């Protein structure tokens, strides 16, 4: 099926579109509004464009008028923007292909991780090795390197600095420390399909291992000698504690509001991602408004990821998750799908507030969340945050690194397709 697109009005910009594709188009968000009129198989179709995807099918979009815009607006005078349409038959995005453009950076990080933890205590090293080798995605340092290289291009840097690389290592150490402590607090036996540190070595060693990694990361952070980044990352460690306290104080509480959930999700997940992306931009010495957009990108991406994770807790199996399915609900943690399902299901409130005391009540609650709108509304929330994250990237010049950041947003959403 052939598709052709004609001139479209995107609010402040009129773009001339010419493209061909053997597939249906996906939506792409451009500025505040976007409409397209396409001829698909001789039929005129009008729709909103929401998402960007790299693919074999591409459209070349050129501003009809030369207009000088700021970096935050993302399109400078006489720049050409490549809008890419997704082929439905295309293989899903994988982190391996997404991070290909920073594969060497990630390999150097993997080689350095154990050495920078230190060799003072063999037990702590064994604990760190257990989680470092547990198939982690290295998503956060990957984001550090992608933003570092995307903003380095903007600032005219030809190579990453020592500070960029050290930041990636610090971020992964902090993330790993938080996982060790999370597993202790949640009494989790499995993570990524492997036994957790506290299951293998005991709670005492796990707590000390997490503390040690936080301390070691803080020492390396101080040696970066950048006060802005030190404050930024230090706030993340504080946010971790705030998030855990907020979660522990609201278990089985069906009056938790969506704003409370989003704040807790920011503390526990998005704060670190936002600090990672902003810190990378700071070390590239870009303008403060670009660094702030990178912070907002990390925040919105992190929130979208957390919402998707909470959806998968209801839609995937224990084998797929690498941990017990519906584990959060079983422990009374009220997440986005549950909050939305509670809006119209008094029976769900009754079950949760009873703390699943009746046989089969947990399974009943899971079915209510799955089938009564909780999942659908949570998906909409994840997409809303993803759209904002894509807009935050408009301050970056077109490059393979920016495309990979956009694909990261889409990779997350593909997990719930």
Swiss-Prot record:
Q: Which GO terms describe its biological process?
A: isoprenoid biosynthetic process; plastoquinone biosynthetic process
Q: Where does Mg(2+) 2 bind?
A: 182, 186
Gene3D superfamilies attached here? Farnesyl Diphosphate Synthase
Spell out the activity-pH relationship.
Optimum pH is 8.0.
Q: Which residues bind isopentenyl diphosphate?
A: 137, 140, 175, 192
Q: Where is the transit peptide?
A: 1-60
Q: For this protein, what is any one GO molecular function term?
A: all-trans-nonaprenyl-diphosphate synthase (geranylgeranyl-diphosphate specific) activity
Pfam families reported for this sequence: polyprenyl_synt (PF00348)
Q: Which PROSITE patterns match?
A: POLYPRENYL_SYNTHASE_1, POLYPRENYL_SYNTHASE_2
The coenzyme or cofactor needed here is: Mg(2+)
List the GO terms this entry assigns under cellular component, sorted alphabetically.
chloroplast; chloroplast stroma; plastid
Signal peptide per UniProt: none
The cofactor note from the UniProt entry for this protein is: Binds 2 Mg(2+) ions per subunit.
InterPro entries recorded: Isoprenoid_synthase_dom_sf, Polyprenyl_synt, Polyprenyl_synt_CS
Span-the-membrane segments of this chain are none
EC number in record: 2.5.1.85
- Give the residues the record marks as binding Mg(2+) 1: 182, 186
Provide the alphabetized UniProt keywords: Chloroplast, Isoprene biosynthesis, Magnesium, Metal-binding, Plastid, Stress response, Transferase, Transit peptide
Coiled-coil residues are none
Q: What does this protein do?
A: Involved in providing solanesyl diphosphate for plastoquinone-9 (PQ-9) formation in plastids. Catalyzes the elongation of the prenyl side chain of PQ-9 in plastids. Contributes to the biosynthesis of plastochromanol-8 (PC-8) in plastids. Does not contribute to the synthesis of tocopherol or ubiquinone. PQ-9 and PC-8 are lipophilic antioxidants that act as protectant against photooxidative stress under high light stress conditions. Prefers geranylgeranyl diphosphate to farnesyl diphosphate as substrate. No activity with geranyl diphosphate or dimethylallyl diphosphate as substrate.
How this chain assembles, per its entry, is: Homodimer. Interacts with FBN5.
What is the name attached to this protein's record? Solanesyl diphosphate synthase 2, chloroplastic
Q: What organism, scientifically named, is this protein from? A: Arabidopsis thaliana (Mouse-ear cress)
| Originating gene | SPS2
């Amino acid at each position: 099926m052939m598709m052709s697109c004609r001139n479209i009005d995107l609010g402040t910009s009129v773009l001339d579109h010419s493209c061909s594709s053997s597939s249906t188009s996906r939506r792409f968000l451009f500025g505040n509004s976007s409409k397209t009129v396409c001829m698909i198989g001789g039929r005129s179709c009008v729709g909103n464009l929401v998402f960007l995807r790299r693919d074999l099918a591409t459209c070349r979009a050129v501003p009809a008028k030369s207009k000088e815009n700021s970096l935050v607006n993302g399109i400078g005078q006489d720049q050409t923007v490549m809008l890419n349409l997704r082929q439905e038959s295309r293989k899903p995005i994988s982190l391996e292909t997404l991070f290909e453009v920073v594969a060497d950076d990630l390999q150097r990080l993997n080689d350095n991780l154990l050495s920078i933890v230190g060799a003072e205590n063999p037990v702590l090293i064994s604990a760190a090795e257990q989680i470092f080798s547990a198939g982690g995605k290295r998503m956060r340092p990957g984001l550090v390197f992608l933003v570092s290289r995307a903003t380095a291009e903007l600032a005219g840097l030809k190579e990453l600095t020592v500070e960029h690389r050290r930041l990636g290592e610090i971020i992964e150490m902090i993330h790993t420390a938080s996982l060790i402590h999370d597993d202790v607090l949640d009494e989790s036996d499995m993570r990524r399909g492997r036994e957790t540190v506290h299951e293998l070595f005991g709670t005492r060693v796990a707590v000390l291992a997490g503390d040690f990694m936080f301390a070691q990361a803080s020492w390396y952070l101080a040696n970066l000698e950048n006060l802005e980044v030190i404050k930024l990352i230090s706030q993340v460690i504080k946010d971790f504690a705030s998030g855990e306290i907020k979660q522990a104080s609201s278990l089985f509480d069906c009056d938790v509001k969506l704003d409370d959930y989003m704040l807790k999700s920011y503390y526990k997940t998005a704060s670190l991602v936002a600090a990672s992306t902003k810190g990378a931009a700071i070390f590239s010495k870009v303008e403060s408004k670009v660094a702030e957009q990178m912070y907002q990108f990390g925040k919105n991406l992190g929130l979208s990821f957390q919402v998707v994770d909470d959806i998968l807790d209801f839609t995937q199996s224990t084998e797929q998750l690498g941990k017990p399915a519906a584990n959060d609900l079983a422990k009374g943690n009220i997440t986005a799908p549950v909050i939305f399902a509670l809006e119209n299901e008094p029976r769900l409130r009754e079950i949760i507030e009873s703390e699943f005391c009746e046989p089969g009540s947990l399974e009943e609650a899971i079915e209510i969340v799955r089938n009564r709108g909780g999942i659908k509304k949570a998906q909409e929330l994840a997409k809303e945050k993803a759209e904002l994250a894509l807009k935050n990237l408009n301050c970056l010049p077109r490059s393979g690194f920016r495309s990979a950041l956009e694909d990261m947003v889409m990779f997350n959403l593909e997990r719930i397709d």
